[in-house]
Each structure stands twice: as structure tokens, then as C-alpha cells.
Amino acid sequence: MPLYEHVFISRQDLSNAQAEGLIEHFSTVLADNGGKVVDREYWGVKTMAYKINKNRKGHYAFLKSDAPSAAVQEMERLMRLHDDVMRVLTIKVDKHAEGPSIQMQKRDERERGDRGDRPDRGDRGERGGFRR
């Protein structure tokens, strides 16, 4: 079966549980039509570059699937009809990348927040202030 990756954005006023419920719902739609979800990720609420339906932010979700095209078309149709889903993007891939997506890796790096040892900045001089 072909491999697909899906990203969808849902409205910002949904709770995290409702957004994750949408992921579960669309995973079930794929399973009911003969496909399977290989991996799913909830990326959280992110600010968008421009407003969509008067929303500046949205809940982002990412699915990796192994499904026939009919199952993907049905899932996309239901996503576009769903009032809470603002945007959908589906791409066909040759193979799924191993491990977490780039977005999740960025989030893990941000959560660590470790800046390490900062070396003493010797170029400032001992006075600290402006040099003339």
C-alpha cells in the first residue's frame, strides 16, 4: 500500500483533549477503510503566518499512514467537512522517516533549555562599558 504523511490544523479554541480526539477520529476513519496509522504526533498550538478563518493560532497534528488511496480520499473528505479542521495537507512519500519528526525534535531541544557553560567574554575588558 502507498505511504502518506498528513498534517492538519484545527481551531485554536479546542482543548488539547479535543484536538487529540480529532487525531484519534481520523485514525479510526483510515483503519475502517483498510489503512493503518503508522505514527501520530500532536505538535501543539502554534502561531500561523496569517489568519485562517479569523484564527491566528491552531492545533497542529501529524499522521504517518499506510493506506489505499480510497481510504486517504475518504479521510480527507471528512476532514474538509469537519468544522474544527481549518487546513489539510497530504503528501505521498516513498518511505517514512525513522524516529520523531523534525518538529518534535525542535520541541525536545527547546524543552531542554540547557545553554551549557558560557565562556567568559574576554573581549569586554575589565571596565565593562563602552570603550573609546
From Swiss-Prot:
Record GO biological process: translation
Listed InterPro entries: Ribosomal_bS6, Ribosomal_bS6_sf, Ribosomal_S6_plastid/chlpt, Transl_elong_EF1B/ribsomal_bS6
Keywords, sorted A to Z: Ribonucleoprotein, Ribosomal protein, RNA-binding, rRNA-binding
GO molecular function: small ribosomal subunit rRNA binding; structural constituent of ribosome
Highest taxon above the source species: Bacteria
Chain positions covered by the region annotation Disordered: 96-132
GO CC term (a single one): cytosolic small ribosomal subunit
UniProt keyword Lipoprotein present: no
Biased composition (Basic and acidic residues): 105-132
Free-text function comment from the UniProt entry: Binds together with bS18 to 16S ribosomal RNA.
Sequence similarity: Belongs to the bacterial ribosomal protein bS6 family.
Record-given protein name: Small ribosomal subunit protein bS6
Organism classification: Bacteria, Pseudomonadati, Pseudomonadota, Alphaproteobacteria, Rhodobacterales
Gene: rpsF
